[in-house]
């Protein structure tokens, strides 16, 4: 359905390794119109952005509970994204996940032929609903995270994406923002852009509907459920927008079991998302300090935390780790602080929230320095096996993974680094392939073996422990707290074993 006249670049799928030629002339009108013709009478839902959230949100909408939709995902024809478009249209879902519902829902969509992908903004002219699931990034001034005190928020790409909707959309379309945005964005940025575009086109600007309902997507074994079977907060920029958002969400979310929560306005829903994530980021930063204290005091911080968790009011106290990763916790407190000053005119930052991000950003560097202090040999030329590259256990998401900072420091020191992750084949940010055969890797020997992600494959795994024991004398470094006391005892009989937060070892 897509035409290619002149070849500009290549987009390579990390899922299959297949390469796709990116067309310079971006015209997919015929493909879009042919798809819509297959679904007469159905409302068209366009999902803007085919990343970890948007691609799966498209699946959920294609498998809506109470209405049949024609779903079209749109992304940019870039080297990073074009392969996703082609993959969806060729019957290969672009996200690898441990959730069996992903494949089930995708197979259902293939049978119904109700999920298409494109790069052509013409698609917005067909949309009854546009769900915005694109990135809105924070740029930290220090790329190596050793001095992350400065940051900037550039809304230009986000604004351009909203303009693309406004230039093409129907006058009464519902634009539902799921992207995590600075509080104030829907009212102060999204709606004004859409209204201006409609006015320039000679269309009324008062029929457009704009709402915000943030996603709580958790890649992993409950990927689909984190969208369809989970609580949602929502609001609109006016009453008709709010009603339209609620009506749409009720068709895709199991609201009988997970009731919707309506807030007073979109400023409130946008604040709810960044506050929710800032709370978690602050908890993690808090524990970073205490884990260091425990190491200095000869204390097992895990033992301490588990004792405190017996108190019902303290069950959510965090455990230490390599650091914070993923797309949300690494930036959301900064979005909130930026909004306070730039959209609402305050002279004050959200100082504590910003500090929490800075502490978390430095954690991979601290983990590396802890390794240096405990290993007591030069790292240059040492062979290091990293167990896990994703930012979270049992998922294949490497965005802003704290493993990257740790990896970079090892690379700077001249280490030979070998990677394993059961959920990641290709580490896009580092442009390296990842081995998924741990048994094969452990046939070789290593100077250092570090557990850097808490995958279940590394937990309570008797076979893994035996293979580690069979290794020549090594330095085993658990940055997550995966190893049990019994496993540490067995491993310590042969190897040096160190765990972040375990000052008793």
Feature names for model-found ranges:
Residues 2-505:
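Structural/interface elements that position substrates and couple domains in central-metabolism enzymes
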């Amino acid at each position: 359905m897509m035409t290619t006249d002149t070849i500009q670049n290549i987009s390579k799928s990390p899922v299959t390794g297949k390469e796709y030629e990116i067309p310079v002339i971006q015209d997919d009108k015929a493909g879009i119109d042919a798809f819509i013709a297959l679904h007469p009478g159905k409302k068209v839902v366009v999902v803007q952005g085919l990343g970890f959230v948007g691609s799966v949100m498209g699946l959920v909408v294609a498998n809506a509970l109470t209405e049949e939709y024609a779903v079209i995902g749109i992304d940019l024809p870039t080297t990073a994204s074009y392969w996703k478009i082609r993959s969806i249209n060729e019957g290969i879902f672009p996200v690898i996940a441990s959730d069996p519902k992903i494949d089930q829902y995708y197979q259902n969509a293939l049978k119904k032929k109700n999920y298409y992908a494109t790069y052509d903004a013409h698609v917005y002219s067909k949309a009854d609903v546009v769900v915005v699931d694109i990135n809105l990034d924070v740029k930290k001034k220090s790329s190596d995270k050793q001095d992350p005190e400065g940051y900037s928020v550039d809304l230009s790409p986000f604004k351009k994406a909203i303009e693309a909707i406004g230039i093409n959309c129907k006058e009464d379309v519902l634009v539902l923002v799921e992207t995590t945005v600075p509080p104030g964005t829907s009212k102060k940025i999204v709606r004004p852009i859409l209204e201006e575009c409609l006015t320039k086109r000679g269309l009324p600007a008062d029929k457009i509907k704009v709402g915000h309902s943030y996603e709580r997507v958790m890649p992993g074994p409950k990927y689909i459920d984190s969208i369809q079977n989970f609580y949602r907060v929502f609001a609109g920029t006016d009453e008709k927008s709010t009603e339209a958002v609620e009506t749409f969400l009720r068709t895709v979310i199991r609201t009988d079991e997970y009731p919707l929560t309506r807030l007073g306005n979109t400023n409130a829903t946008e604040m709810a998302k960044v506050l929710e994530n800032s709370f978690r980021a602050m908890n993690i930063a808090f524990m970073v300090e205490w884990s260091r204290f425990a190491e200095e005091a000869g204390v097992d911080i895990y033992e301490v935390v588990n004792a405190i968790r017996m108190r019902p009011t303290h069950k959510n106290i965090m455990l230490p780790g390599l650091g914070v990763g993923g797309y949300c916790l690494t930036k959301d407190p900064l979005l909130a602080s930026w909004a306070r000053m730039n959209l609402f005119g305050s002279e004050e930052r959200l100082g504590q929230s910003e500090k929490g991000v800075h502490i978390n950003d430095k954690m991979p560097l601290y983990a590396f320095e802890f390794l240096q202090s405990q290993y007591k040999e030069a790292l240059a030329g040492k062979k290091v096996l990293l167990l896990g590259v994703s930012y979270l256990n049992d998922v294949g998401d490497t965005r802003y993974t704290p493993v990257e900072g740790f990896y970079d420091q090892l690379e700077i020191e001249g280490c030979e680094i070998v990677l394993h992750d059961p959920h990641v084949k290709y580490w896009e940010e580092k442009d390296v392939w990842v081995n998924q055969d741990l048994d094969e890797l452990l046939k070789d020997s290593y100077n250092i073996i570090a557990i850097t992600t808490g995958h279940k494959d590394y937990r309570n795994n008797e076979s893994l422990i035996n293979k580690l024991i069979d290794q020549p004398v090594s330095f085993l470094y658990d940055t997550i707290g995966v190893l049990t006391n019994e496993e540490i005892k067995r491993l310590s009989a042969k190897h040096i074993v160190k765990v972040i937060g375990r000052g008793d070892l």
